[in-house]
């Protein structure tokens, strides 16, 4: 249903992502933030399901600055590799990349953000610091407590 896209952050960095356009008139847009496993089949499926409900959904590849197009499965070995990406995250860079995703869909209508695991924490911080968001949902964002103040 969706397709790969290129997004440009405010510092000029180009990152990949996945975009699924709404079936029928768009109700708005959602930025979908990945778990530590990248924009893999699961995150693409989440975007496709939101699109089937009438939302444009875009998932920025927030690890592209470290390893372009990183995607992982869920085996113990793959989890160990994926965890290396979050050992010392660059929050400023991730937020620039998320803002690029927000900007890419802001013409659609109201924009919300939803994230899972690391993405849940990113969604929380994005809602507090970035422009253009009307709603945010963070699922099991373990790093949220670091930003509670």
Q: Residue spans of the language-model regions?
A:
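N-terminal cap/leader regions of alpha/beta-hydrolase-fold enzymes
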Residues: 1-149
């Amino acid at each position: 249903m969706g397709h790969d896209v290129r997004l440009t952050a405010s510092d000029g960095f180009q990152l990949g992502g996945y975009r699924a356009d709404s079936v029928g008139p768009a109700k708005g847009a959602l930025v979908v933030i990945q778990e530590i496993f990248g924009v893999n089949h699961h995150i693409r499926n989440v975007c496709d399901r939101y699109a089937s409900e009438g939302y444009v959904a875009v998932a920025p590849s927030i690890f592209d600055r470290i390893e372009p197009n990183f995607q992982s499965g869920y085996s113990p070995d793959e989890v160990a590799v994926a965890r290396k990406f979050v050992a010392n995250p660059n929050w400023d860079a991730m937020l620039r990349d998320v803002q690029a995703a927000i900007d890419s869909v802001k013409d659609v209508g109201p924009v919300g953000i939803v994230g899972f695991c690391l993405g849940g924490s990113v969604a929380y911080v994005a809602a507090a610091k970035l422009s253009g968001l009307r709603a945010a949902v963070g699922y099991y964002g373990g790093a949220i407590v670091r930003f509670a103040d």
